[in-house]
């Protein structure tokens, strides 16, 4: 049927003759038929269709020939190879030898064919197309128009099929290189683009040939300047196209470009511009190989960022005197301008090149601050606005990079970027203030962007400069010529600066600041209004930072702020963002100024409650009441309290999890502050709702619900009815919860407080509760035994319960638990297990020495044949000792000396003692310390790894208590002939590192290298321990190791490499098994790199790590691949330019990972593991896809294309990208 319709359409073409409209309609009908999925075609129709469409391409009516071109796209997909080759030949003939007026159409048609042909047909088409295009480019007498068309078509061809035409690469490259010397600028420009597109698929030899030829052209000093400029552009384009592969050619190209920069004539600005652009490409795409030239490039950018030979700046230094303002504005307006002056291009290129160096060389930040920062600040006065924006952006890059690499570090070191930045703050503010007085809105927006980034990096740096900045903020908000963008930027900065500085700093300027901000609240544009309301929130805190008097009279500002916000709060016809900001801000106003707004509260509070009825503003209103309830002013809520509690109780039933969490927090604050004003009936309803929220499936919600229960029980209004409701509704849920192995963290702490409150405040029988808790440990027929982790939770609740019930009840419970141990000795019952853990938990909190022989009873459980019982006994003994060190520590030490067979268990008991003491900072007696150290050092060489690990942890925690004794003792043993001893002492150092500042830090700092340099030890166990220690230092105390990293990093990277000598084959009879003894070491090394990238980026040179080490890891064992995917994602986020430079080399291992399919007979575990691996790789690919400039990599684009063609893979990728 479709063929009959097409035949009818073809007959129309023969009948239409000279009538253009008929020809148009016939072509349109044909296009519609070709686009139908049901359209099928036979050989005869192929010939007729292709002939008619090619004929229509020559139609004198442009709209008809345009439709004919569109017909080619679906036609190419539906005709055979022979027909496509025939059409390609005819189109080439039209392009090369046809009439001039048909050339454009033929070119577009050819590009359409190239875009649509299937990859399987591409080789046949290329055999026909490529020689003719090469002929069109190089042929004698060919016009520049034909050359340009051929170059554009070849550009499309090599971009899509470059890897399929390797046989033509050399001939095509030679042809293109000759065109770089063409007299026509358009031909040269398109040649540069074509060579760059071809470059990514060229072999290394041909790439070298291209580079050598271009450098040779540049060496010809007699060449025309425009030819030289083209060749410089070619160098930059090649580098951008091939990335890290260009690195080997930098030795030949960088000196030539620097020479052109410095020796170009004064009028040849474009030569300098292109040279600097090429150098920027080198910095971003070849960060590893450009390293030797970075200092020289830095000096070059600093020279040319102020290059302005036609203009002399004789203006005197800026002052902050406001009387000069008008004069300066006039000066700005009448600045030197010259349409022929192109020096601004050089300055812009220099600024961008400097930005490239800043973002790619984090290790040079200190040098950049010392040499470039003052120059950049000086260039804020740049007279060309576009260049000024680039200078601002470069400085913002510097600030952001400072924030990235100094995250979590102190700024006391005089060589640290943050410290150096602090020294420049005054100059920055002075220069920015001048920019804020400029007339240009764009300039002022850029200036505020710089200030905003400055405050993000150095939150408290503007305290001494607020007075000079306020006029600029006022002008930005008050000036009628100000745009919304400028107002938003000024408001965002104001909010940041108010939030990050001490309130008294702003008190002299509150009047000047508040007026324009409150005016902005009334703006029509919602984004300005929302931002102004956020500023008001910060302003409220600044105006009255505490209810105690601070010598500042805040009262004049209360009603203006309240009125401005109230007008927005009551206006329903506005954007959701404004509504939410108004609610949040009003919550702060009432919380802070409530005592001054008593007359207004009865009209304001009902509006906030009303906003809780609207689903859009409900969550924000709930949070606002939490702020009001925590106010030290104890705001009178009587007019809305009952309604408020009823609304909140209803929200506990809502499906919205975030709303339920916010509701629990708000209810807790309300019950704490207004508990005696809330009726017990309301509490009983609340408790019913709370019971349904206590579940192991949501521990955060559970913790909040339990906290509210405790508040209800401990409040003044706790009645017998409330206690009964808690026992009947909540207690059963709590007893179910305590049996879960997943219970941990805040939920476990709140559960302990819940049991404590039950005994203290809710008149609950201690023995009933205790029996209920102990019963939780009994195995049930349905669920079997209670998990080990649950027993620990139950034991902690038992201990808290006993202490809350008083000494008498506590003592009787301890006796009962001891009886259980006597009666059940030799069994593996949960009852005995729980008894041991409970004694440990009680003993840790209370001295149990009054119970004679308790230690002997506990230690008898060491004889148990069951490991769980022995472990629990060890835990119990150590914790009981914590309750009375002088009584029990000598006993444990004596037992370790005399009980050889029980040493491992006893060492765990000692570990419990030491770990608890290191946290509580309790001191041991000297005699005990000496005895403990002697004992621990004696066990350093134990054959059992478990013993050595316990010893290392004990030594590490002892170092926190006695650093002066431990650090030298550990250091001495780093040179021990026994490898196990060396490994144990470096592991001990790892355990001594904690997040909080310690006296140990200053003692270990000078000695730290002797421990970490064991990374080059001959024994792999020692190396692994050193790597693990380095990782821990990098995470918690990066400042201690920064100075060692230049020496440590190459050694660390070496540990990521597969070592053949560590791979062995074990003969298992029927089959052989390969064992890789270096796997755990490599895993530890990659984990350490991940930590270093996160905490010490300014010391890590990512370029030297990614290739070859990360690339190798992406092809290593399953566990290491997953780690490397994480590292790659982190690097893509923190230093994208370094990743972009070597991206092509990373695509293949990622492609292999996502394409891998397990064998058909693989077990489910292998399939699951492979799915995890694919998802891990897709996350890394998603991170790479977000890098700006990733489109330069044809290989990565190919990877994304392959993924799109695989529907299941693309769906997984989209899911991950949307997470």
Curated annotation (Swiss-Prot):
Key assembly factor of SCF (SKP1-CUL1-F-box protein) E3 ubiquitin ligase complexes that promotes the exchange of the substrate-recognition F-box subunit in SCF complexes, thereby playing a key role in the cellular repertoire of SCF complexes. Acts as a F-box protein exchange factor. Required for SCF(TIR1) function. Modulates SCF(TIR1) function through its interactions with the CUL1 subunit. Represses photomorphogenesis by promoting HY5 degradation in darkness. Highly expressed in roots. Expressed in stems, flowers and siliques. SUPFAM superfamilies: ARM repeat. Disruption phenotype: Developmental phenotypes such as dwarfism, organ defects, short inflorescences and mishaped leaves. Low fertility and reduced responses to hormones. It comes from Arabidopsis thaliana. HEAT repeats lie at residues 44-81, 83-119, 209-244, 248-288, 327-363, 367-404, 423-460, 464-503, 599-636, 639-676, 808-848, 850-883, 927-964, 966-998, 1002-1039, 1043-1079, 1101-1137, 1141-1180. Belongs to the CAND family. The keyword Transcription regulation applies. InterPro entries: ARM-like, ARM-type_fold, CAND1/CAND2, TATA-bd_TIP120. GO terms for cellular component: plant-type cell wall; plasma membrane. The keyword Transcription applies. Signal peptide: none annotated. Interacts with CUL1 and CUL4. Binds unneddylated CUL1, but cannot bind CUL1 once it has been neddylated. Residues 311-340 are annotated as: Disordered. This is Cullin-associated NEDD8-dissociated protein 1. GO terms for biological process: response to auxin; SCF complex assembly; vegetative to reproductive phase transition of meristem; xylem and phloem pattern formation. Keywords: Acetylation, Repeat, Transcription, Transcription regulation, Ubl conjugation pathway. Residues 314-340 have a biased composition (Acidic residues). Pfam families: TIP120. The modification N-acetylalanine is found at residue 2.
């Amino acid at each position: 049927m479709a063929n009959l319709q097409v035949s009818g359409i073809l007959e129309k073409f023969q009948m239409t003759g000279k009538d253009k409209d008929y020809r148009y309609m016939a072509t349109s009908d044909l296009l519609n038929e070709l686009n139908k999925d049901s359209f099928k075609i036979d050989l005869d129709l192929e010939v007729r269709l292709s002939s008619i469409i090619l004929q229509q391409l020559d139609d004198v009516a442009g709209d008809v020939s345009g439709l004919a071109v569109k017909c080619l796209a679906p036609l190419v997909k539906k005709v055979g190879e022979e027909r496509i080759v025939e059409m390609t030949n005819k189109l080439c003939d039209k392009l090369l030898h046809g009439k001039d007026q048909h050339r454009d159409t033929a070119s577009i048609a050819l590009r359409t064919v190239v875009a649509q042909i299937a990859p399987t047909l591409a080789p046949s088409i290329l055999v026909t197309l490529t020689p003719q295009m090469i002929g069109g480019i190089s042929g004698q007498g060919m016009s520049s128009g034909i050359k340009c068309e051929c170059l554009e078509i070849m550009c499309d061809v090599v971009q899509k099929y470059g890897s399929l035409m390797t046989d033509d690469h050399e001939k095509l490259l030679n042809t293109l290189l000759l065109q770089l010397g063409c007299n026509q600028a358009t031909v040269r420009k398109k040649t540069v683009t074509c060579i760059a597109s071809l470059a990514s698929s060229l072999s290394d030899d041909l790439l070298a040939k291209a580079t050598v030829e271009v450098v040779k052209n540049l060496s010809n000093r007699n060449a025309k300047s425009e030819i030289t400029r083209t060749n410089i552009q070619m160098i930059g384009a090649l580098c951008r196209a091939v990335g890290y592969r260009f690195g080997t050619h930098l030795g030949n190209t960088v000196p030539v470009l620097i020479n052109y920069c410095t020796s170009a004539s004064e009028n040849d600005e474009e030569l300098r511009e292109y040279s600097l652009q090429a150098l920027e490409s080198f910095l971003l795409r070849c960060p590893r190989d450009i390293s030797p030239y970075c200092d020289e490039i830095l000096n070059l950018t600093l020279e040319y960022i102020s290059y302005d030979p036609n203009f002399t700046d004789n203006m005197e230094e800026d002052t902050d005197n406001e009387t000069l303002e008008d004069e300066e504005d006039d000066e700005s307006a009448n600045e030197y301008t010259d349409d022929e002056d192109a020096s601004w291009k050089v300055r812009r290129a220099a600024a961008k090149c400097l930005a490239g160096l800043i973002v790619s060389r984090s290790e040079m930040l200190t040098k950049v601050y010392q040499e470039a920062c003052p120059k950049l600040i000086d260039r804020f006065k740049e007279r060309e606005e576009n260049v000024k924006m680039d200078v601002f952006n470069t400085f913002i890059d510097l600030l952001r990079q400072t924030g990235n690499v100094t995250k979590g570090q102190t700024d006391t070191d005089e060589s640290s970027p943050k410290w150096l930045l602090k020294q420049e703050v005054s100059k920055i503010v002075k220069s920015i203030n001048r920019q804020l007085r400029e007339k240009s809105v764009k300039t002022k927006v850029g200036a505020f962007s710089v200030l905003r980034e400055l405050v993000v990096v150095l939150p408290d740096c503007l305290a001494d400069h607020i007075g000079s900045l306020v006029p600029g903020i006022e002008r930005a908000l008050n000036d009628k010529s100000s745009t919304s963008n400028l107002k938003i930027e000024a408001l965002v900065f104001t909010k940041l600066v108010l939030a990050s500085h001490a309130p008294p700093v702003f008190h002299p300027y509150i009047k000047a600041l508040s007026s324009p901000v409150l005016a902005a609240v009334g703006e029509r544009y919602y984004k300005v209004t929302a931002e102004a309301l956020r500023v008001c929130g910060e302003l409220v805190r600044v105006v009255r930072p505490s209810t105690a008097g601070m010598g500042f009279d805040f009262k004049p500002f209360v009603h203006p702020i309240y009125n401005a916000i109230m007008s927005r709060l009551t206006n329903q016809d506005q954007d959701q963002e404004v509504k939410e900001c108004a609610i949040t801000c009003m919550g702060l106003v009432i919380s802070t100024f409530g005592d001054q707004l008593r007359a207004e509260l009865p009209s304001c509070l009902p509006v906030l409650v009303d906003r809780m009825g609207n689903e859009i503003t409900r969550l924000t209103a709930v949070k606002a009441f939490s702020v009001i309830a925590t106010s030290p002013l104890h705001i009178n809520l009587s007019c809305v309290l009952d309604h408020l509690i009823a609304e909140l109780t209803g929200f506990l039933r809502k499906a919205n999890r975030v709303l339920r969490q916010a509701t629990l927090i708000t209810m807790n604050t309300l019950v704490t502050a207004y508990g005696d004003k809330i009726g017990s009936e309301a509490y009983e309803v609340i408790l019913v709702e709370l019971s349904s929220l206590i579940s192991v499936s949501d521990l955060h919600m559970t913790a909040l619900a339990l906290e509210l229960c405790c508040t209800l029980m401990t409040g003044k209004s706790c009645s017998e009815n409330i206690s009964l409701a808690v026992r009947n509704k909540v207690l059963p849920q709590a007893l179910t919860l305590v049996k879960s192995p997943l219970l941990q963290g805040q939920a476990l702490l709140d559960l302990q407080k819940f049991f404590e409150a039950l005994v203290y405040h809710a008149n609950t029988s201690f023995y009933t509760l205790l029996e209920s808790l102990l019963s939780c440990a009994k195995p049930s027929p349905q669920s079997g035994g209670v998990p080990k982790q649950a027993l620990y939770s139950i034991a902690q609740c038992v201990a808290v319960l006993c202490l809350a019930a008083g000494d008498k009840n506590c003592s009787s419970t301890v006796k009962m638990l001891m009886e259980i141990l006597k009666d059940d000795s030799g069994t593996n019952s949960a009852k005995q297990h729980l008894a041991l853990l409970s004694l440990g938990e009680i003993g840790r909190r209370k001295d149990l020495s009054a119970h004679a022989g308790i230690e002997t009873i506990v230690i008898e459980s060491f004889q148990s044949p069951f490991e769980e019982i022995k472990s629990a006994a060890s835990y119990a003994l150590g914790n009981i000792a914590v309750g009375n060190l002088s009584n029990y520590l000598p006993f444990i030490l004596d037992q370790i000396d005399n009980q050889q067979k029980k040493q491992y268990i006893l060492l765990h008991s000692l570990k419990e003692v030491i770990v608890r003491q290191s946290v509580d900072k309790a001191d041991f007696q000297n005699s005990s310390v000496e005895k403990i150290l002697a004992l621990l050092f004696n066990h350093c060489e134990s054959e059992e790894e478990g013993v050595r690990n316990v010893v290392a942890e004990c030594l590490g925690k002892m170092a926190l208590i006695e650093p002066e004794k431990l650090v030298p003792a550990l250091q001495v043993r780093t040179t021990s002939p026994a490898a196990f001893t060396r490994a144990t002492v470096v592991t001990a150092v790892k355990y001594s590192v904690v997040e909080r500042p310690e006296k140990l830090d200053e003692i270990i700092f000078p000695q730290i290298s002797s421990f970490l340099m064991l990374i080059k030890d001959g024994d792999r166990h020692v190396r692994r321990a050193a790597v693990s220690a380095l990782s821990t230092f990098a995470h918690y105390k990066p400042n201690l190791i920064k100075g060692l990293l230049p020496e440590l990093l190459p050694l660390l990277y070496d540990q990521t490499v597969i070592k053949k000598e560590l791979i062995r084959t074990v003969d298992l009879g029927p089959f052989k098994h390969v064992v890789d003894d270096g796997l755990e070491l490599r895993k530890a090394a990659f984990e350490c790199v991940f930590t270093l990238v996160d905490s010490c980026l300014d010391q890590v040179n990512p370029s030297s790590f990614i290739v070859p080490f990360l690339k190798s890891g992406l092809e290593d064992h399953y566990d290491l691949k997953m780690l490397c995917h994480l590292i790659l994602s982190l690097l893509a986020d923190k230093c994208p330019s370094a990743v972009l430079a070597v991206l092509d080399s990373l695509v293949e291992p990622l492609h292999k990972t996502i394409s891998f399919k397990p064998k058909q007979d693989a077990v489910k575990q292998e399939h699951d593991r492979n799915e995890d691996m694919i998802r891990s790789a897709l996350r890394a690919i998603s991170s790479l896809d977000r890098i700006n400039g990733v489109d330069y990599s044809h290989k990565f684009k190919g990877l994304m294309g392959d993924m799109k063609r695989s529907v299941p893979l693309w769906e997984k990728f989209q899911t991950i990208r949307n997470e």
